[in-house]
Swiss-Prot record:
Keywords: DNA-directed RNA polymerase, Magnesium, Metal-binding, Nucleotidyltransferase, Transcription, Transferase, Zinc. It is an enzyme of class 2 (transferase). The gene is rpoC. It comes from Orientia tsutsugamushi (strain Ikeda). The RNAP catalytic core consists of 2 alpha, 1 beta, 1 beta' and 1 omega subunit. When a sigma factor is associated with the core the holoenzyme is formed, which can initiate transcription. It catalyses: RNA(n) + a ribonucleoside 5'-triphosphate = RNA(n+1) + diphosphate. Belongs to the RNA polymerase beta' chain family. DNA-dependent RNA polymerase catalyzes the transcription of DNA into RNA using the four ribonucleoside triphosphates as substrates. Disulfide bonds: none annotated. InterPro entries: DNA-dir_RpoC_beta_prime, DNA-dir_RpoC_beta_prime_bact, RNA_pol_asu, RNA_pol_N, RNA_pol_Rpb1_1, RNA_pol_Rpb1_3, RNA_pol_Rpb1_3_sf, RNA_pol_Rpb1_4. The keyword Transcription applies. Signal peptide: none annotated. This is DNA-directed RNA polymerase subunit beta'. Its EC number is 2.7.7.6. Mg(2+) binds at D467, D469, D471.
């Protein structure tokens, strides 16, 4: 282990090449600072402005810091290497390299101690906590504003009391000057700190904390002080070291003084700060030496000045205003050198500049192979110069390096021959910024080209997110053999076929290639040669050449196929010549059926083929196939001649009809509103939905129209009638229905800059042109889209960084942890539609236990077996609903994760290799799409993309209905109204296997009965999407309670219609008044309260803003609506709303209007209300539990009624639940599944696929800390948040000794907090809040075990992931073997000595 302070050891004594595996940070003692120093700096001068030599004893003194020139003393007496190590007797300078001026330190002996500002001002202030003082009081003492009593002596004062000048005078007069001792400044604080007996203070505080019962604040304060004392005791630091008596001066080369032209100098700010400090310190020394005695006030002022100048040096601006230079810019202090993007950590240690690199614009290289890139000749020569020199020498063309250099400058043909030899099989790395994921840097073999732009293979554009509109890329040359080997094996473009985010091919053809293949595989009626029969591909090519058939002719072709029994038979296949040409590219073999290519190729279809080729034939075949596919696509894209003009933009004829129909609908809603049947909000929502349906209908008609092609022109063939715009959209090559809809349909609804949708759509399209008004309302949304792009790119980039920070130290450490835990995975259902199948989710996972077919009971999956594509098909056929799989969340390894719990490495399709940095892969996979999506927001041009609000569930297939918890009543219209909050409608197939399930809302209408057979499309449940009803369970007469006009209920008149609505408002109540709880009671004919099925009175409490639907005294039937609560849906759903949601989840923030969830199973009761809160009491079913009380805000709608039975985890108030509540109530697995589903819902909305395991990795990092609930016999403090691994290890030791173990509970931290509280202080300091992290780490004497990626990059060691992981493992084995050999040898020697 290396102590961070030992980095400053005198260089001639330290072995700089010594390997280390840990770094420790401590507070430096005065003795240690002196031991680093090569001499005291006593003068503020820097260099002599005449001779330009450093001044003796100044800030650049050569005697202290070393010679300015290599092996030359200052006076010039000793020059050259032969005098190395001699100290010149004249000038006192040691003859050595000038490099030592980067390492040697000096020091200042301070005339008065100063308090280190990090320990004073970094909140919470460490010195104030240790002395149990107020921060303001501490500062008053340090800055000479008040005296502190050090020893009360015989006076009634107390130790630590503060006295002003007047109070001190008064006390001295009263009690005598010698009867008590006071102090002032940092010196007094140092004395107090030195007097602390930490161990006895710890014991006293532990007793005190046990006695504190009532005050939570006091308890936390004591615990905080106790934790700090534990840190000091554990680290061996002394509290008085927080006060500096000797100040180190950093080496001069790290604060350079550079000479500019015209004799001026540019200097580092640190020199000026040190100069001020030395001047003030020297003045103070002089004043202290004065025999006549200097007035106390003058001395104290000078001491204060020294303290202030030290504060500025350590952290300028930490206290009060920052000190500025002559240009009104704040001085850059030592802290500023470390902090932020321009600080030492991020600028120089994590982001280094790279030599042997170049940069140029990229152009397309369609002639290249997938593993190649085109490198400009001049650029290659510059990059490979050393290799060229070596090659010229090796071939005997040049005798020396100098000669080789001259030959290269002349540019003779030999140079280019040498370059061609050198670059052969020497991969280069191409990088495109922003480097969002590992595929943004790939290796290629360079091909020399004459141009000045780098040529890039078209298929890797998706991975780089590159296009050729001026993008630039950087080239890097891997120099060492190991680097070249890694580049070739791990980073070659041919080895990066699959996306690490979702396991799908990423070298998939796009744009023109897709269009070319789509055109090639089209089948058109009436083409020449239709119906002909062919027997070989030679015949096909011959027929095409002679124009006997066209590419799109429907023909028959004789070929071998695999029949249903799996036998290879000859058969006639209906196909087209184009499809047969595509089929020729498939690798030889029968694994892929011709049916796969015997259809019109879209982007999805092509992707599926590439995926199949990879799965069945491996990597090499896929690379060859992809290259052939690209060339074929480009060829036929060119031959097709597809382009579009105004004639291709066919506006649907039905558009005006749809407009008129929708306008009639809107008028109907206006009428309902004016008659008071619906509220303004409901009308708005209905209008928005009507126009959304209109745009959908127009879009459908438009697509039908352009699909039919040009039917009006005469004399065209069917091929000529094809519509280019339709072909582009249908093939998924370019554009989307949304964009075409704006072009030739209707632009549709528009969102304001606020996100709210304007209820008047743009009916025109861009082909017809917009009216002035339409243009006007469309502008704000479009402009916001462009402005958002810039802002959201930044937000997404920051999310990526935070994710990487939290997960960078997470690797695969072992093959198997042996756990039997896992997550139960089911299909994801939204609105009754399966959006993600079970098969998609379990692919690449490992089964926890054996899985059998539910019908045949045949074993499908064995325990510990990885689920591949074949197994997925078996799961689909067997109709299995859920599978328990191994998960990162349930892995039992203390460090990292095991391969079995992680499952398949998505970038290779095999089980993940040990040493893979799965944390970084996860962070990149989640962060990269966020950036992509935010950048793509503006493509739709401000058009609102909100879907129509769902109002029913329909059967997605034929099947049988099964109803769970069917609590419903039949209303006056003979409809079944659901009264249960846990009613579910299940759709099962003929065998009884569940296909999907729908959660029916309270108040919705059930249209089917249990066991009923339904056909696809049958409506099962319907509800009002714009209002939540409050429904009566019994028939009876309505009576209002606590409804006082103007107090708890108000008649609101709609200004536009004059209709009066009775709305519940927040009751205005004074203190001591009766609490009003507006509700509707139901009475029987005798005016007696009715009783509900749960035995309680029929009372329905009304939340604020609910609208009454009944009058007092009317007779209502069971199932009738008493009141309704309007729902407001107005936002557009896209990643712009979704990205903040993702951040909210990963930061574990409390949602704005969060839900309250039931902690136990129980029965709901309402207690006495407070002024603005409602009291809900949950009476547990289990009598051993205490009832739980919830205080709920009155304005929010409570989803349960009195007497309702709720289950653990049920929502009591609607909203997004707080993640910490889910963890507390439901546990880690439930929390994991909730976060995964919420985040996936956001990405799914944009069509982005990310594997669940990446989200699981991040959640695991959020759950790495636990809170101590009972410290047992450990040194932990109650409520302390510590690493789970540390607690488990401590408990093992305690258990072995028979002592009480520490008890703990899991806690969830946001990714930022998790990054800052990581075990590595180097990693945390380089992320955020550098000064605070380093202060904490120094006090606790933290040890960084260098386990993550960042800390190893910072200290310049190989990262412990990938190849580095195996290097470390080999080193461990070697070290162990060395120990064993040495031990054996020692034992042998000892034995020999004994015999002798």
């Amino acid at each position: 282990m290396v102590d961070i302070t030992n980095f400053f050891k005198k260089t001639n004594k330290a072995d700089s090449s010594q390997a280390f595996n840990r770094v420790r940070i401590n507070i430096a003692s005065p003795e240690q600072i002196r031991s680093w120093s090569y001499g005291e700096v006593t003068k503020p001068e820097t260099i002599n402005y005449r001779t330009f030599k450093p001044e003796k004893d100044g800030l650049f003194c050569a005697k202290i810091f070393g010679p300015v020139k290599d092996y030359e003393c200052l006076c010039g007496k000793y020059k050259r290497m032969k005098y190395r190590g001699i100290v010149c007797e004249k000038c006192g300078v040691e003859v050595t390299t000038s490099k030592v001026r980067r390492e040697r330190m000096g020091h200042i002996e301070l005339a008065s101690p100063i308090a280190h500002i990090w320990f004073v001002r970094s909140l919470p202030s460490r010195i104030s906590i240790l002395l149990d003082m107020n921060l303001k009081d501490l500062e008053r003492v340090i800055y000479f504003e008040a005296y502190i009593v050090m020893d009360p002596g015989l006076s009634p004062l107390h130790k630590g009391d503060l006295l002003t000048e007047e109070m001190l005078q008064q006390a001295q007069n009263e009690y005598g000057e010698d009867n008590f001792i006071v102090g002032i400044g940092a010196e007094a604080i140092r004395t107090l700190l030195a007097e602390l007996d930490l161990k006895s203070l710890r014991n006293a505080l532990q007793e005190e904390v046990n006695n504190v019962i009532n005050s939570d604040f006091k308890r936390k304060k004591i615990l905080r002080r106790l934790k700090l004392i534990e840190d000091f005791i554990g680290s061996g630091n002394k509290p008085e070291w927080m006060i500096v008596t000797v100040l180190p001066i950093i080496p001069p080369e790290l604060r350079p003084l550079v000479m500019l032209d015209a004799g001026r100098f540019a200097s580092s700010d640190l020199n000026e700060l040190y100069r001020r400090l030395i001047n003030r310190n020297n003045r103070l020394k002089y004043l202290k030496k004065e025999e006549d005695g200097v007035p106390g006030i003058v001395l104290r002022n000078e001491q204060r000045m020294v303290q202030l100048s030290a504060d500025t040096l350590f952290d300028n601006g930490k206290r009060g205003k920052a000190v500025k230079n002559s240009n009104k810019r704040p001085f850059k202090s030592l802290s500023d050198m470390l902090k932020g993007k321009q600080g030492r950590f991020r600028q120089n240690l994590l982001g280094k500049r790279v030599d042997y690199s170049g940069r140029s614009v990229i152009v397309v290289g369609p002639e290249l192979k997938l593993h190649q890139c085109g490198l400009p000749k001049q650029m290659a020569l510059e990059l490979f110069k050393p290799f060229v020199y070596a090659e010229l020498e090796r071939c005997g063309i040049a005798t020396t390096i100098k000669a080789a250099k001259r030959i290269v400058e002349l540019g003779t043909p030999d140079v280019w021959n040498a370059l061609a030899k050198v670059i052969k099989h020497h991969p280069v790395l191409l990088n495109r910024a922003p480097t969002l994921h590992c595929l943004s840097i790939q290796a290629f073999e360079p091909v020399l080209i004459e141009d000045k732009a780098i040529q890039l293979h078209p298929l890797v554009c998706t991975a780089f997110n590159a296009d050729f509109d001026g993008d630039q890329m950087a080239v890097h040359v891997p120099l060492s053999t190991e680097a070249q080997l890694e580049a070739r094996v791990l980073m070659m473009s041919t080895n990066n076929i699959l996306s690490p985010a979702n396991g799908r091919p990423i070298i998939v053809p796009d744009k023109d290639i897709v269009l070319g293949l789509y055109y090639l595989t089209l089948s058109i009626d009436g083409e020449v040669g239709e119906g002909r029969l062919f027997g070989s591909m030679a015949e096909i090519h011959h027929a095409l050449f002679n124009k006997v058939v066209s590419l799109h002719s429907k023909i028959k072709f004789r070929k071998y196929i695999i029949n249903a029994d799996g036998d290879k038979v000859m058969a006639l296949v209906n196909t087209t010549p184009g499809r047969l040409i595509l089929g020729e590219l498939l690798p030889d073999g029968d694994s892929i059926s011709f049916d796969v290519v015997n259809k019109v190729m879209t982007k999805k279809g092509i992707s599926a083929i590439v995926d199949m080729v990879y799965r069945y034939y491996g990597q090499k075949a896929t690379v060859v196939f992809a290259d052939k596919l690209m060339k074929l696509g480009f060829k036929y894209a060119c031959m097709s001649g597809i382009s579009f003009g105004m004639d291709d933009m066919i506006v649907p004829e039905t558009k005006s009809k749809h407009v008129n129909d929708t306008l009639l609908e809107v008028q109907e809603f206006e009428r309902q509103y004016s008659e008071g049947l619906i509220t303004s909000g409901e009308k708005y929502n209905k209008v928005i939905d009507a126009w959304s349906r209109y745009t959908d209908r127009v879009a459908n008609d438009m697509m039908k129209g352009i699909a039919a092609g040009d039917q009006t022109s005469v004399g065209l063939t069917n091929q000529e009638r094809l519509n280019s715009i339709f072909m582009m959209a249908d093939s998924e090559a370019r554009s989307s229905v949304t964009q075409i809809k704006q072009l030739i349909g209707s632009k549709g609804l528009i969102a304001k800059a606020s996100g709210e949708i304007i209820d008047r759509p743009i009916l025109s399209n861009f082909c017809e042109g917009l009216t002035v008004f339409e243009c006007f309302i469309g502008i704000p949304g479009t402009r916001k889209g462009l402005a958002d792009t810039a802002v959201k790119t930044k937000v997404s980039g920051h999310l990526s960084r935070k994710l990487s920070e939290s997960a960078h130290g997470y690797f695969v450490k072992r093959e198997d942890c042996g756990t039997t835990n896992g997550l139960i995975i089911t299909a994801v259902v939204e609105g009754g539609v399966i959006v993600v199948t079970l098969a998609e989710q379990v692919l690449g996972r490992v089964a926890v236990s054996n899985v059998y077919c539910p019908v045949t009971k045949v074993l499908i999956l064995q325990q510990g077996e990885m689920i591949d594509e074949y197994k997925v098909e078996l799961i689909n056929t067997a109709g299995i609903n859920s599978i328990k799989v191994r998960s990162v969340l349930t892995c039992e390894l203390q460090e990292g994760v095991c391969a079995k719990c992680y499952g398949r490495d998505l970038s290779t399709g095999k089980l993940v290799a040990i040493g893979t940095a799965v944390g970084i892969v996860a962070a990149q996979s989640i962060g990269e799409p966020g950036t992509q999506l935010t950048m793509r927001t503006f493509h739709i041009g401000g058009a609102a993309t909100r879907g129509v609000e769902a109002s029913s569930f329909e059967a997605i297939v034929d099947g049988r209905v099964k109803i769970i918890n069917p609590n419903f009543v039949v209303n006056s219209n003979n409809k079944s109204v659901i009264m249960s909050r846990s009613c579910e409608v299940i759709l099962a197939d003929n065998v009884g296997q569940e296909i999907t399930r729908y959660k029916a809302q309270y108040g919705s209408i059930l249209l089917v009965t249990d066991g009923q057979e339904v056909t696809k499309g049958t409506a099962l449940v319907v509800w009002d999407p714009y209002a939540m009803p409050i429904v009566t369970e019994k028939s009876g007469y309505v009576m209002f309670k606590d409804m006082i006009d103007g107090v708890s209920v108000k008649d609101i008149i709609d200004e536009s219609t004059g209709i009066v609505n009775r709305v519940i408002i927040e009751p205005k109540q004074g203190r001591g008044e009766v609490v009003l709880r507006p509700r509707i009671c139901l009475l029987d004919q005798n005016k007696q309260p009715l009783t509900l099925s749960n035995g309680l009175e029929a009372e329905y409490f009304l939340p604020v803003n609910s609208i009454l639907s009944v009058e007092e005294g009317v007779n209502v039937s069971a199932g009738d609506i008493l009141a309704r609560i309007p729902r407001e849906f107005a936002g557009t759903k896209d990643i712009t709303g979704g990205l903040p949601r993702v951040i909210e989840l990963f930061e574990a923030r409390k949602p704005k209007n969060h839900a309250v969830i039931a902690e136990i199973d129980g029965c709901v009761k309402f207690g006495k209300d407070y002024k603005s809160k409602r009291r809900l009491i949950l009476q547990p079913n289990d009598e051993s539990h205490e009832p739980i009380e919830y205080i709920l805000p009155k304005g929010r709608h409570v989803t349960v009624n009195e007497g309702d039975v709720v289950k653990k985890g049920d929502m009591l108030i609607e909203g997004s639940p707080v993640l910490q509540d889910i963890l507390k109530v439901m546990g880690v697995e439930a929390l994991g599944l909730y976060i995964i589903n919420e985040i996936q819902a956001v990405y799914r909305l944009q069509g982005v696929k990310i594997d669940n395991k990446h989200i699981e990795v991040i959640i695991t990092r959020m759950l790495q800390k636990v809170e101590i609930t009972d410290s047992g016999d450990s040194n932990f403090v109650i409520e302390e948040k510590v690493n789970k691994r540390a607690v488990i290890n401590t408990n093992k030791k305690l258990k072995a000794k028979g002592l009480r173990e520490a008890q703990y509970r899991p806690i969830l931290q946001g990714i930022t907090k998790a990054s800052l509280q990581t075990e590595s202080f180097i990693s945390a300091a380089s992320f955020q809040e550098t000064t605070r992290v380093l202060t904490e780490a120094a006090i606790a004497g933290k040890v960084d075990k260098l386990e993550g990626l960042k800390e190893n990059v910072i200290v310049g060691q190989t990262i412990p992931a990938g190849t580095g992981f195996y290097i470390n493992e080999i080193k461990k084995i070697a070290r162990q073997r060395d120990k064993e050999i040495i031990a054996a040898r020692d034992a042998e020697l000892q034995e020999n000595n004994t015999e002798a």
